[in-house]
Amino acid sequence: MRSSGRKKEQIRPVKITRNFTKYAEGSVLIEVGDTKVLCTASIEEKVPPFLKGSGEGWITAEYNMLPRSTQSRKQREINKLKIDGRTMEIQRLIGRALRSAVDMKALGEKTIWIDCDVLQADGGTRTTSITGSFVALVDAVNKLHQKKPFNVYPIRHFVSAVSVGIVGEEKVLDLCYEEDHVAKVDMNVVMTEEGEFIEIQGTGEAGPFSRKELDELLNLAEKGAKQMIQAQKDALKTDSLWIGTGRE
């Protein structure tokens, strides 16, 4: 039994609140245990220079932690005059994860900006950001579709993310900060609804881990990703992205 009382294969409680802010085309507050992230999706009717005239869209992400999202105050990155390596890595991960879910040709020459602001951090902020941002992305794309229906609906499949790791001798799902801080192995896994992998980030913090342990962790991650996708479906009130558009 873990310190939180959860079983090793149990995720934290998930709450997804849509339309959390007024102005963004997609806006979600996602809470996974004590981790809380505000995710917004904003649409621009233009693309980066390298995509002009291509007929393809683009999705990019920014990630930020509020100063008191952590136990001690974290300095705002704007005051450092640079983005640190961790932040850059995370926002690239979020962008890659969401782009993998979207047909850019079907989207057309538009940019969707994903902004993830961590309000409170207790482990899993990057995976929580991906899971919440996907719901915000669906809401934003559906608003586009309501204004002018797509010939082909751009979002191809559900995407979620979850952390797994080895704490002590136990392989556990959805690590909180207390567990993440002492984990021998820490891994973030991004998956589709069909069980396909988009990204696997794994580190042996206290030494190498075996292929058998890797397979066991990935099996655990698949269970967690499915639960996260079910939370997304519950929030969207649909089992199908097509139903989410109102299309027949």
UniProtKB/Swiss-Prot annotation:
Q: Which Gene Ontology BP annotations are present?
A: rRNA catabolic process; rRNA processing; tRNA processing
Could you tell me the keywords of this UniProt record? Answer: Nucleotidyltransferase, RNA-binding, rRNA processing, Transferase, tRNA processing, tRNA-binding
Q: Which residues form a coiled coil?
A: none
Pfam families (alphabetical): RNase_PH, RNase_PH_C
GO function term, MF aspect, one: 3'-5'-RNA exonuclease activity
- Fetch the InterPro entries from UniProt: ExoRNase_PH_dom1, ExoRNase_PH_dom2, ExoRNase_PH_dom2_sf, PNPase/RNase_PH_dom_sf, Ribosomal_Su5_D2-typ_SF, RNase_PH, RNase_PH_bac-type, RNase_PH_CS
EC number(s): the record gives 2.7.7.56
Q: Which reaction does it catalyse?
A: tRNA(n+1) + phosphate = tRNA(n) + a ribonucleoside 5'-diphosphate
First-tier enzyme category under EC? transferase
Q: Where does phosphate bind?
A: 86, 124-126
Q: Do you know which CDD domains this protein is assigned to? A: RNase_PH_bact (cd11362)
Its subunit composition reads: Homohexameric ring arranged as a trimer of dimers.
What does the sequence similarity comment in the record state about its family? Answer: Belongs to the RNase PH family.
Function field: Phosphorolytic 3'-5' exoribonuclease that plays an important role in tRNA 3'-end maturation. Removes nucleotide residues following the 3'-CCA terminus of tRNAs; can also add nucleotides to the ends of RNA molecules by using nucleoside diphosphates as substrates, but this may not be physiologically important. Probably plays a role in initiation of 16S rRNA degradation (leading to ribosome degradation) during starvation.
The protein's matches in PANTHER family, at most eight in alphabetical order, are given as: EXOSOME COMPLEX COMPONENT, EXOSOME COMPLEX COMPONENT RRP41
UniProt name for this protein: Ribonuclease PH
